[in-house]
Curated annotation (Swiss-Prot):
The gene is hisS. Belongs to the class-II aminoacyl-tRNA synthetase family. Keywords: Aminoacyl-tRNA synthetase, ATP-binding, Cytoplasm, Ligase, Nucleotide-binding, Protein biosynthesis. This is Histidine--tRNA ligase. It comes from Streptococcus pyogenes serotype M1. SUPFAM superfamilies: Class II aaRS ABD-related, Class II aaRS and biotin synthetases. The keyword Membrane does not apply. It holds the Pfam family tRNA-synt_His. GO terms for molecular function: ATP binding; catalytic activity, acting on a protein; histidine-tRNA ligase activity; transferase activity. InterPro entries: aa-tRNA-synth_II (IPR006195), aa-tRNA-synth_II/BPL/LPL (IPR045864), Anticodon-bd (IPR004154), Anticodon-bd_dom_sf (IPR036621), His-tRNA-ligase (IPR015807), HisRS-like_core (IPR041715), HisRS/HisZ (IPR004516), HisRS_anticodon (IPR033656).
Length: 426
């Protein structure tokens, strides 16, 4: 049997992993500017953590969950999204306690799992960056969080980003709109896709989210949820729009956007960018003021977003963005003969301990092959170390581009490599 990775997964090899690490580090730096701290939750949760929060009727729960019973007959699921596990952790660890500074700002970076048809930018194991902010109902929280995502895209150089905005209002507003949508869609039930016929009975707002052609046609003239917002919901949404304008963040109102998860209320948003003529969502989120209470905590407002790392990296590549990834090596040691083997290890280790990147030959190859490796590694400096150099206690180091060279003692190399490097590279 030929052993291969499971369908819908990927191996991220070192060349690509460097891009991942760069994007993750920019995200971490950005979030820390906004006073967010990292949280790490388990990759698997009790099934109810996801099903009850995300929604029993959502596609995630009905079609896409990786769930199983463990040896203790506990119903377990691999996490399909990040918000529910973070809310569970927030409640379980009593981060709502008065001594904890509010709002509580958390971010996560990690794997999520959904059993769906693998396609471009969509895998069964995928990686998500997400943020959650607990404890502030202030519309400024909505705008700050949206602005943070916008700031991240600016730092990464992503172009043509458009903010799509909508409000789902309060539970009362949503209930009134739900009925209006049922009244509108019921006469055209037979024209809907099979999935949306089911959604019409279980959660009619999800019909607006459908990607099926017949469903898109059916909802073209559907009533707008913004016409059903109560006074408080309307005031919240107006404040969000005003603050976005104050920060010069352009937006478009998208009344058919409802988000695929059941826990959202008030502000919801997506950032969309154009890639090769197609619109792609790169980030989505919104407000969820009832979720903490649903998990047994006190009623606590929340706001957050998630973005897929695979999709973000695909957009970076398609938009031709070059990430400033350091690929050069400081020095390569070409090693000739068994008598130089031990000293080469001593020297390369001493150089690394001074904060430099260094590599040496371990395979006993001819000098030409070793120099070729130095070029492949983009080594700035190259040193040839043979038995005669070991006996003399010194060797020649060359600038691999200019060919300028200098003879240095091993003692200098092991204690003051910075000066040697500066001398040859300046």
């Amino acid at each position: 049997m030929k052993l291969q990775k499971p369908k819908g997964t990927q191996d991220i090899l070192p060349g690509d992993a460097a891009k991942w690490q760069y994007v993750e580090s920019v995200a971490r730096d950005t979030f820390s500017q906004y006073n967010y701290g990292e949280i790490r939750t388990p990759m698997f949760e009790h099934y109810e953590v996801i099903s009850r929060s995300v929604g029993d009727t959502t596609d995630i729960v009905t079609k896409e969950m990786y769930d199983f019973y463990d040896k203790g007959d506990r119903h377990i699921t691999l996490r399909p999204e990040g918000t529910a596990p973070v809310v569970r952790s927030y409640v379980e660890n009593k981060l709502f306690a008065p001594e904890v500074q509010k709002p509580v700002k958390l971010y996560y970076i990690g794997s999520m799992f959904r059993y769906e048809r693998p396609q471009a930018g969509r895998l069964r194991e995928f990686h998500q960056i997400g943020v959650e902010c607990f404890g502030a109902a202030n519309p400024a929280t909505d705008v700050e969080t949206i602005a943070m995502a916008y700031h991240l895209f600016e730092k990464l150089g992503i172009k043509d980003v458009t903010l799509h905005l909508n409000s789902l209002g309060s539970p009362e507003s949503r209930a009134a709109y739900r009925q209006a949508l049922i009244d509108y869609l019921t006469p055209m039930r037979d024209q809907l896709s099979k999935d949306s016929q089911r959604r019409l009975d279980e959660n009619p707002l999800r019909v607006l989210d459908s990607k099926e052609k017949e469903d898109k046609l059916a909802v073209e003239k559907a009533p707008s949820i913004l016409d059903y917002l109560d006074e408080e919901s309307q005031a919240h949404f107006e404040a969000v729009k005003d603050m976005l304008e104050a920060l010069d963040i352009p937006y478009v109102i998208d009344t058919n956007m409802v988000r695929g998860l059941d826990y959202y209320s008030h502000t919801i948003f997506e950032f969309i960018t154009s890639v090769e003529g197609s619109d792609l969502t790169i980030c989505a989120g919104g407000r969820y003021d009832s979720l903490v209470g649903y998990f047994g905590g006190p009623e606590t407002p929340g706001f957050g977003f998630g973005l897929g790392l695979e999709r973000l990296l695909m957009i970076i590549e398609k938009q031709g963005i070059t990430l400033p990834i350091e690929t050069e090596m400081d020095i390569y040691l070409a090693v000739l003969g068994d008598g130089a083997n031990s000293k080469a290890l001593e020297l390369v280790q001493a150089i690394r301990r001074q904060g430099f990147t260094a590599e040496r030959d371990y395979l006993g190859r001819k000098i030409k092959a070793q120099f070729k490796s130095a070029d492949t590694f983009k080594a700035k400096l190259v040193m040839t170390l043979g038995e005669s150099e070991v006996e003399a206690g010194k060797a020649v180091i060359k600038n691999n581009r200019s060919r300028q060279e200098v003879e240095v003692s091993f003692e200098d190399m092991m204690t003051n490599f910075a000066n040697i490097s500066e001398q040859l590279l300046s």
